[in-house]
């Protein structure tokens, strides 16, 4: 007896959701084709290079198509010591990566500007190579998180532009 009621409730919920005009963000017409036509400009640094790679992956950039949008970014990276050992050496760092970006239509028009911040922590190692590897790993994780946040922001902004 309970199972038919649950099925009927689920069916009516889906019917109401379809009736309200709900469109999945990545459904047709969606924003995925638009995201893949955004060219990315980053600062000429190692972190900038990693951000370009991460953004091109997140946006699924299609090199075979002409870019409709241009994304310009500016990076601010701050590293802060968090913990100290009894011998007053740092045991952990916090890395804060702030990416300010501007999305502009190639054909001209109003730009979309915003910023995202990604915060990660990593352990400070005693060996020099391990310390460098830990810092780079932290930078890569921060860049990946910033690229994901930018994709989400751009998806939302472009979906709002496509609304009638």
What is each of the regions a protein language model found here?
Residues 62-68, 72-115, 120-137, 141, ...:
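Surface-exposed short loop/turn segments
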Residues 41-72:
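Post-signal-peptide N-terminal segment of Sec-exported extracytoplasmic proteins
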Residues 15-19:
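C-terminal motif of bacterial Sec signal peptides marking the signal peptidase cleavage site
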Residues 162-164:
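Short, solvent-exposed mixed-charge patches
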Residues 21-24:
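Bacterial signal peptide processing site
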Residues 32-42, 127-130:
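Acidic/histidine-rich, surface-exposed loop or edge segments in extracytoplasmic proteins
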